[in-house]
From Swiss-Prot:
Protein name: Terminal nucleotidyltransferase 4B
Any one GO molecular-function label of the UniProt entry: DNA binding
Residues joined by cross-link Glycyl lysine isopeptide (Lys-Gly) (interchain with G-Cter in SUMO2): K531, K558, K573, K587
Keywords (A to Z) from UniProt: ATP-binding, Cell cycle, Cell division, Cytoplasm, DNA-binding, DNA-directed DNA polymerase, Isopeptide bond, Magnesium, Manganese, Metal-binding, Mitosis, mRNA processing, Nucleotide-binding, Nucleotidyltransferase, Nucleus, Phosphoprotein, rRNA processing, Transferase, Ubl conjugation
InterPro entries membership: MTPAP-like_central, NT_sf, PAP_assoc, Trf4-like
Family: Belongs to the DNA polymerase type-B-like family.
Catalytic activity: RNA(n) + ATP = RNA(n)-3'-adenine ribonucleotide + diphosphate
Region ranges (Disordered): 1-115, 484-633
Binding, Mg(2+): D191, D193
Residue ranges of domain PAP-associated in the record: 322-382
Length: 633
């Protein structure tokens, strides 16, 4: 939130009153009015579009908007941030968002957010009040915004395309990934940081830039060479996925910084939750880019580490720490109390605050006043935050977030209208509809949900017979069921306790999500759908060419002779003499079942009845291993 008389980053004018967020109805919101991006046009072309095109058919049209749509009517300046940043919420007024059951213009998905408020797709339930509810919502936000496997796959393909161009120029060059993509703390629209190691007298920035244009890896207008920066880089946008990539040369600290972040993440388990929320908070306000004066990911991470190091709470390292309390106190520290003009941040040796006047005289690039001083723990003479000249605007945004969240978790918040359904975190963070659509497109292009899973039995063998045909097989076994009917009725009482502890063959159908946990006798691949487990007929199992019914007659004879003396306690004692079946592969039984007398094994039935199986010290195959022809005989 920018205060009166100040201008946000990017040169956009701000009137006297705060207008960081404007009503949804205003014409200033162009999120859903500009032409679709390249990935959106290819998605509408159909599923036949290649996920890795060698040459894109057309450039991104967002750079050539009509004048009526690309200009802010209030400020008269080009609304470029809407096109460059899908996550930008400039032009939205959170307090004026109304309940909606669908997509709000520029507000994001409402259907994913419990169908109540737009822009909060992580909100799938009602939370508790106060900081407890904020903690729960931060957890859900982290789960929703965490990288998906298909997003990682898509990014690796982008890296492969760029690496192939680099290898073509310099076969001995080494390309490595660092930054948020390396650590896993990246948002759906975060960029990819690459570093190229090689032997050059002069950095080949323009050589690589020309090669990237020639191979059409990047959009023609997106490739930029920042040769005057402290760390010269090449910035580009992938022509197909619109993923932004930064390429540097021979920078060792980038890879080392990724390892440092992983170490701190292990020490402070709360860090990933805080960092992801803070990155989204800055990203949607265009305060995350260093070359525009914002705070980069590495600086933001070090600020969070310093906050936890010097935090007065003793539970900062405990995994179940309340994330809501820590987030509010982070905003309070860096939004109100931290003195940016006189105080610097040091992470090394447990963390401390230092006087900027003393340490900046010994900096590598000489004495230069810096608005935000953060000492690099990997190179103490390096000021990580020296390029963040817009740190005061970030400070004001943090102060705004502290005020909003403090009121949202206060005791009087329960008297606010819609306090039970309104998102607390959504007061300062929103996910735009463009980001949600972009993630859906990635899931369709690189996800696994469109690949049909073949039906299988319990051993992971593909079924060539329809499940309904297998159900008919159950009707052909009525005679065999009647043959065992009497022994079931006579042994029903002693089996009630014995069956609860005995090993069971088929997987219980009552647990659809844990289809493999109930089968303790099988190491084979479990069936992925419980519906297919229901179709296995409860037939008498064969052992090689011998029928188990021979063993059944022997076991029933012994049971009838001792039935008058057996009690439930004796039935439980016989449990200790029984042996479990162990099978190391789907080829057949490989263990031995040894018992002093006929042991009665009971299996759970998926059709509501209990079926008993008897064996007497012989090797047998599990019923899942029976051939399909035997099941339907």
């Amino acid at each position: 939130m920018f205060r009166s008389g100040e201008r946000p980053l990017g040169g956009l004018a701000v009137p006297a009153e705060q207008r960081d967020f404007l009503p949804l109805e205003t014409t200033n919101n162009n999120n859903n009015h500009h032409q679709p991006a390249a990935w959106a046009r290819r998605a509408s072309a159909g599923p036949s579009a290649s996920p890795v095109p060698s040459a894109p058919s057309s450039p991104r049209p967002a750079a050539a908007l009509p004048a009526s749509e690309s200009t802010d009517p209030a400020s008269g300046s080009s609304n470029k941030r809407k096109r460059d940043n899908k996550a930008s919420t400039y032009g939205l007024n959170y307090s004026l968002l109304q309940p909606s059951g669908g997509r709000a213009a520029g507000g994001g998905r409402a259907d994913g957010g419990g169908g109540v408020y737009s822009g909060t797709p992580w909100k799938r339930r009602n939370y508790n009040q106060g900081v407890v509810g904020l903690h729960e919502e931060i957890s859900d936000f982290y789960e929703y915004m965490s990288p998906r496997p298909e997003e990682e796959k898509m990014r690796m393909e982008v890296v492969s395309r760029i690496e192939s161009v680099i290898k073509e120029l310099w076969p001995s060059a080494d390309v490595q990934i660092f930054g948020s993509f390396k650590t896993g703390l990246y948002l759906p629209t975060s960029d990819i940081d690459l570093v190229v190691f090689g032997k050059w007298e002069n950095l080949p920035l323009w050589t690589l830039e020309e090669a990237l244009r020639k191979h059409k890896v990047a959009d023609e207008d997106s490739v930029k060479v920042l040769d005057k920066a402290t760390v010269p880089i090449i910035k580009l946008t992938d022509s197909f996925t619109e993923v932004k990539v930064d390429i540097s040369f021979n920078v060792q600290n980038g890879v080392r910084a990724a390892d440092l972040i992983k170490d701190f993440t292990k020490k402070y388990p709360v860090l990933p939750y805080l960092v992801l929320v803070l990155k989204q908070f800055l990203l949607q306000r265009d305060l995350n880019e260093v070359f525009t004066g914002g705070i980069g990911s590495y600086s933001l991470f070090l600020m969070a580490v310093s906050f936890l190091q010097l935090h007065p709470r003793e539970d900062a390292c405990i995994p179940n720490t309340n994330y809501g309390v820590l987030l509010i106190e982070f905003f309070e520290l860096y939004g109100r109390h931290f003195n940016y003009l006189k105080t610097g941040i040091r992470i090394k040796d447990g963390g401390s605050y230092v006087a900027k006047d003393e340490v900046q005289k010994n900096m590598l690039d000489g004495y230069r006043p810096s608005m935000l001083y953060i000492e690099d723990p990997l190179q103490p003479g390096n000021d990580v935050g020296r390029s963040s000249y817009g740190a005061m605007q970030v400070k004001q945004a943090f102060d705004y977030a502290y005020v909003v969240l403090s009121h949202a978790v206060s005791p009087i918040a329960k008297y606010y209208p819609n306090n039970e359904t309104e998102s607390i975190l959504g007061r300062i963070i929103r996910v735009t509809d463009e980001v949600a659509t972009y993630r859906d497109w990635i899931s369709k292009q690189w996800g696994l949900q469109n690949r049909p899973e073949p039906s299988c039995n319990g051993n992971g063998v593909t079924l060539i017979v329809d499940t309904q045909q297998l159900d008919k097989c159950n009707n052909n076994l009525s005679e065999e069921k009647e043959a065992l009917g009497k022994c079931r009725s006579n042994a029903s009482e002693p089996l009630s306790k014995h069956s609860s502890n005995s090993s069971s063959g088929p997987v219980s159908s009552s647990s659809a999500t844990q289809s493999s946990s109930s089968d303790v006798d099988s190491d084979a691949t479990p069936c992925k759908t419980p519906k297919q487990l229901l179709c296995r007929p409860p037939t008498v199992t064969r052992v090689g060419s011998q029928d188990v019914s021979l063993e059944v007659s022997q076991a029933v004879g012994k049971m009838q002779s001792t039935q008058t003396t057996n009690t439930p306690n004796n039935a439980n004692k016989s449990q200790h003499g029984s042996a479990r079946l162990f099978r190391s592969s789907s080829k057949g039984f490989q263990g031995t079942a040894q018992t002093s007398h006929g042991a009665l094994m009971t299996s759970k039935q998926h059709q509501g009845k209990s079926n008993t199986q008897y064996y007497h010290g012989k090797k047998r195959r599990h019923k899942r291993d029976a051939p399909l022809s035997e099941l339907c005989r």
